Amino acid sequence: MSHEIESVNGRASMVFAGETPWHGLGHRLQGDESADQIREMAGLDWNVQVEPLYRKIDGEFVEFPLANASVRDMDNTNLGCVGPRWTPYQNESMFECFRPMVENGLMKWHTAGSLRNGQRVWCLCELNLENSEITPGDEIRKFAMLSNGHDGKLAVHFGFTPIRVVCANLSL
């Protein structure tokens, strides 16, 4: 499996703190960026719109009521086919979920990005807690991750993980 990091205009849609990921893609965080700056650096400064789908019947286009298209607003990229009750969880909301905890010193921004041409997105924060060791030299780090599928195939997911998520191989 490849990393599946999205590239828009030759620019990887990912940010990271600390060590450069194995794939060498993304933009290094300095540690003082705001949530909005990180969202922009990660190429996640766009929204998802829900648009109707149509089918051709007897030469005329008729709205198809059982599904809609999820579409990225900045470039009209089709992200998926979703049900009529599906509501997008915007990238900005993902960062807003973590913002109060980062601002209060409970965690710090670590990685964020877009996979599969914008269909999947994630944001990872490292908790400001002491790392654990199961055995000497085997350090366990503590992260919180929020991931989301704009393609209608993955619900919003929040969880804790000891894994530094930097690509599709480790997440979603």
Protein language model regions, located:
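Intrinsic disorder/low-complexity polar-acidic segments
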Residues: 93-172
